[in-house]
Amino acid sequence: MVLSRAKRLLRGNLDGTSRTEGEVIVGAGTTVENSILRGPLIVGERCVIKNSYIGPFTSIYDEVTIRNSEIEHSIVLERCTIQDIPVRIEASLIGKEVRIQRSQLKPTAYRFMVGDSSLVDVL
């Protein structure tokens, strides 16, 4: 689907503290709590979006959980979890069943498992 031509369609459940702006599609069985969805964007079915910001030109496939994080201009494939990320994720492609989370381990360090022909930009 071309996101810039998307129409507003909310099949999921948005609580009273969440808001949508622009063309936003939310699939059936998806729950959105205390979050901002700024379109154009699409969120698939059976997703959980909590305490998060989903920005424009983002496609989120089915069964994705995003908590306490921000993402825009990105594609997130099915069954991913993005949780407690302190910096906005942008211009990213995240594969199936990927888990991105803030580590509580010390000493603090970046840890990567990266596939062939990939690019990783770090702060």
Predicted regions mapped to residue ranges:
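Left-handed beta-helix
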Residues: 1-123
